[in-house]
C-alpha cells in the first residue's frame, strides 16, 4: 500500500463507506485518487466488492496500531535562555499547562499508556510525572555532550509501533491517533531555511541544499515495525562514530537523499515548536516562565518593562558561564549567568571588587550591573568588535601596549590570585581521585621546582588580569578611533603582572621564538634575562 491507499483504508476502518465524495473529504485526497485507490485495495484483498474492510485489512490495522511513545526531554534547550537556568524546556507552561503534560494527556486520549521519557538536564524536575502519569523515566547521562540521537539509543528496543516526540512542542490539535498504517515524520507547511527536507509530489521527504529552504521539521514521528528495525540498527551504527555525537535522531531516518518514512504535513498554526523565550512570549504572553529572575533583574537594572527585552540570543562561548545577548530600548547588552559549580572556582565578591577598581578607566566593557552575591552581570554589547589575532604581530603589539598601560596604573584590590595555592585548591576538588595523567606527579614536582626562582624575582604585585588571552582583547571603533578593551576579569587579583604576558603566550600556542617576540612587544626598552626566565617559568 502507498500513502494514499493507506489513508483511504484507514478512513474506511473508522467509518463505513457512503460514497466516494465523502471518502475524498475524510481522507484528504482527490476523487481521482480515491477511485484509483479503491480499485487497488480491492485487488490487493484489503476491501471486498462492497467496499468494506476484509479480515486482511483488520489484521494489518491491528499489527500497526500505536502501542507506545517516547518523549525526548534530556537536552539543555540552549536557546531558551534565560528560562533554561531555572526550568527544563519540557516543563515550560503554555496557558498554565506544562508542555510535556499536554503531550502525555494527548497520548492518553488515544489510548497510549506506555510512555518513556528520556531525561538528563534537571532530570529530578520530571520525577513527579512517574506518579502522576505513570510514565517511565530513562536517564541519559551524556546529555551535556551528545545530542538526542544518543537519547533515542537508550530506548531503541521500544521503537516498534511508537511515536517519537520532542518535549518542546505545543499542539493545538491532538497529533496522535488510535490507528496508523504507515511510518511518517511530521513537517509543517511553513518554509524555513533551517530545515533539511522538503515534501515532493509523492509526499516523500527529500533533502535540500543548506539554506535553500524546506518544510519546517516538527520532530514528531511514528514508526511501524519494519522501519523501527531499520532506524534502530542505524542508530546503533551512528552512535559508534564520534562525528555523530552532536547529531539529531533524524539522522537515522535518512537513506541517500531522502527519509525512509513518508511526510505528514500539518498547518504551521497547529503545531508550535518553542525554542526561545520570545517564541514562548508569542504563544502565551502570560506564561509563568516568562517571569524569570533574569528578566526581572534586567528590568530593574535598566529601568525597563519585560516587553522592552527583545532579540534574545544565546552566546555559547565561555568556559564557566551561560550568557545571552538581548536588546533593550534599542541598545544591545550581554547578560552573564554563572554556570553550575562556578561558585567553587570563582569568588564573585572579588570579581565585583575588580570591576569597581577599574570602573571609569576605559579599560573594560561598560558594566550596567553586577551582583557580587550570585555573579549575574549585564554589560553593554560592543558592536562590531573583533578579538586579537595572535598571528598578526601588529595586533599583538597593540595588545601589549594596552596591557602595559593597564599595568602602569598599578591598581590595587584586597585579594591576591595565588598561582600555587590555586593548584592545590583544584586538587581538593578531585576528592582524593588520582589524576588520569600518569606523569602528573612528576610534572607537578617540576612545576613546584620553579617556585623559588619565581618568588625571588616576582617583584611588586599589582592588579593583574590573569586571563589575558587573545580572545579577551577586543578591538572596537569609538568615535572613529580604534580602541582595545580587555574583558572577562573573573580571575583578576593582585599578582606579578608578567603573569599576563605568559597567559597570552600559552593560549596563543607560541613557540620560543614567538614568546621572545611577544616579550619584545611588551618591553619596548628591552627585557633583562632574569625577567625573561621568570616569564618562561610562568609559561611552564
Feature map (PLM): residue ranges:
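N-terminal glycine-rich phosphate-binding loop and ensuing alpha1 helix
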Residues: 9-14, 20-22, 26-27, 56-123
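Conserved alpha/beta core of the MobA/IspD/sugar-nucleotide pyrophosphorylase nucleotidyltransferase superfamily
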Residues: 13-16, 51-69, 216-301
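Conserved core of the sugar-phosphate nucleotidyltransferase
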Residues: 19, 172-248
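Conserved beta-loop-beta/alpha segment of the NTase-like Rossmann-fold superfamily
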Residues: 126-196
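Helix-rich C-terminal or lid/interface subdomains of diverse kinases
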Residues: 256-257, 276, 522-540
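An alpha-helical support segment within catalytic cores of ATP-dependent transferases
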Residues: 293-311, 411-466, 470, 476-478, ...
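ATP-binding pocket architecture of kinase catalytic cores
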Residues: 313-420, 434-441
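Active-site activation/catalytic loop segments of kinase-like enzymes and analogous catalytic loops
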Residues: 498-528
